[in-house]
Regions:
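Hydrophobic helix-and-loop "lid/oligomerization" segment in the mid-to-C-terminal part
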Residues: 2-107, 127, 178-398, 409-417, ...
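Helical lid/core segments from catalytic subdomains that handle acyl or acyl-like groups
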Residues: 403
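Short alpha-helices
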Residues: 143-182, 188-201, 208-210
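A contiguous loop/helix-start segment that scaffolds small-molecule binding in enzyme catalytic cores
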Residues: 223-226, 406-477
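Histidine-centered active-site/metal-ligand motif
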Residues: 136-137, 152, 322, 380, ...
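Hydrophobic, small-residue-rich alpha-helical packing segments that form membrane-like cores
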Residues: 68-167
């Protein structure tokens, strides 16, 4: 039976290896390879009034990365444009067509993408465009030929072994620019509200520097003067947002524009100058979110028709399934079946897939083992994107399950963590304060679960707009 001191000790032990626990202690920009080389080139471009193009991504991390870089460049009165690729028209990240579209720029900066853009980098070189890549995805064996590459995962980068998102990499570049441009009073903390959206949405580990940034960022969101947050507070009729609100309400909302239409609308929403402008963009985003929910529900149901529950890896596909929601469906399948899931949308001779993992299982490495069958892939240990010839789908499904079976050890266990058994009398305001002290909960700091023995359900009632929550009153046996 756990007492409160034991609960404190168990939760404290999760952070025993954390080094950076204060904002003043977090790693410096100089610890990211090429950061100051990139900053000096950007400073030169600003001073010479060169046209700078910022190329982002269509998820929350990419949208936020673009927004904070745009805010800094605006503060510097720089000459710049932004391009967030359209999922359906442009595809993912910097590519040849986007370089051609931006060939009037002399400097291109990627945020949350670019580490695999080898062909696009060559075209930049041919056109005399300097390319600065900022990314956090796993680098390929051969890096693009860029002017500078800022990625904590690249070789010979002294940055600590902590998973950070694309917006954080962009934020660190701005930190280097602050030094290079001698902006002593420039407020780097003003980006923490937006940064927190990206860290939570991209499911970064909530330990070490990520933990302190999110704790401070949540406070910033709740006191933020940005029109976008004021509009969101009004929409949800909430004055205070917590981690779960960001994760389950705000992040999916902002993501929906890129999933259904164009992520640039969410970028403009985050950059809104006043409440009227923010409300206009929010109305559009809410329509996209409603459409996303409807399509997600339909696809989730149809995706389960051909699932073999005996296989280690769920692989399913369909003709012209909506590309914007297959990632969410993969997440839901992984959660339901407690095993990794890959969902493909077939469009003629090619299929695009989205993979989601569970527990500590490295889905990206497993996908990489089937590289000979793929047209392309990329991502993280927990999530990945795939492009494959439609004719190879059955081969891929068989091969990836065989590859998983041959691995002697694999961990599909989820992050749900039952700390132990507690006495009902221990559930009081003091316990709530203890649990609140160790917030925010998320990756690597799962919300603690407790076991009650001998408790009976006295009443149960569905609550909420969609009756998706259950209010239970328990009675001691």
């Amino acid at each position: 039976m756990l007492d409160k001191e034991a609960i404190k000790e168990l939760l404290s032990s999760r952070f025993s290896n954390d080094i950076h626990t204060k904002l003043s202690e977090i790693p410096l920009p100089c610890e990211l390879k090429d950061t100051f080389k990139a900053a000096k080139r950007i400073k030169e471009a600003i001073q010479n009034d060169e046209l700078i193009a910022v190329v982002g991504d269509y998820d929350v991390d990419g949208i936020v990365s673009t927004a904070i870089m745009a805010e800094f460049l605006t503060d510097m009165s720089a000459n710049f444009i932004i391009k967030i690729p359209n999922r359906f028209k442009d595809g993912y990240g910097l590519n040849e067509d986007i370089v051609k579209e931006l060939d009037h720029a002399t400097l291109i900066i990627t945020v949350d993408n670019g580490i695999s853009a080898n062909e696009a980098a060559l075209i930049c070189k041919q056109k005399g465009i300097d390319l600065i890549i900022t990314d956090h995805h796993m680098p390929p064996p051969i890096l693009p030929q860029a002017y500078a590459i800022i990625n904590p995962k690249q070789a010979n980068c002294p940055f600590p072994n902590i998973e950070i998102c694309g917006a954080q990499v962009a934020w660190y570049l701005i930190g280097a620019l602050k030094e290079v441009c001698e902006l002593r009073n420039y407020d780097m903390a003003k980006f923490l509200d937006l940064l927190t959206l990206a860290i939570i949405a991209d499911m970064m580990e909530l330990r070490d520097l990520n933990r302190i940034l999110v704790r401070l960022g949540l406070a910033r969101i709740n006191s933020s003067k940005r029109a976008c947050f004021e509009a969101i507070k009004n929409y949800y009729n909430k004055e205070k947002f917590e981690f779960d609100d960001i994760s389950f309400l705000i992040a999916p909302l902002i993501n929906s524009a890129g999933r259904i239409d164009d992520a640039t609308i969410s970028y403009e929403f985050l950059r809104s100058r006043n409440l009227k402008e923010a409300n206009g963009y929010l109305d559009k985003i809410c329509e996209f979110n409603a459409s996303r929910k409807a399509q997600e529900k339909a696809l989730f149901e149809s995706s389960q028709n051909d699932i073999d529950e005996n296989e280690d890896i769920i692989v399913t596909w369909g003709n012209e399934w909506h590309e914007g929601v297959i990632g969410i469906v993969a997440s839901r399948l992984a959660k339901k079946y407690k095993k990794p899931a890959i969902v493909f949308s077939i469009d003629g001779e090619r299929a695009k897939g989205s993979a989601r993992s569970v527990g500590k299982f490295d889905i990206l490495s497993l996908i990489a083992s089937q590289e000979s069958l793929l047209c392309g892939y990329g991502g993280h240990k927990g999530a990945a994107g795939i492009v494959i010839e439609s004719a190879n789908l059955n081969k891929f499904k068989t091969a990836i399950n065989q590859s998983c079976f041959l691995q002697e050890l694999y961990d599909f266990s989820t992050n749900d963590e039952i700390l132990g058994q507690i006495n009902p009398e221990a559930i009081d305001y003091e316990l709530i304060e203890i649990l609140e002290f160790f917030e925010p909960y998320g990756q690597k700091n799962p919300r603690p679960l407790f076991e009650l023995k001998g408790a009976m359900v006295k009443s149960a009632k569905r609550i909420g707009k969609e009756e998706s929550h259950l209010k239970i009153i328990l009675q001691k046996d």
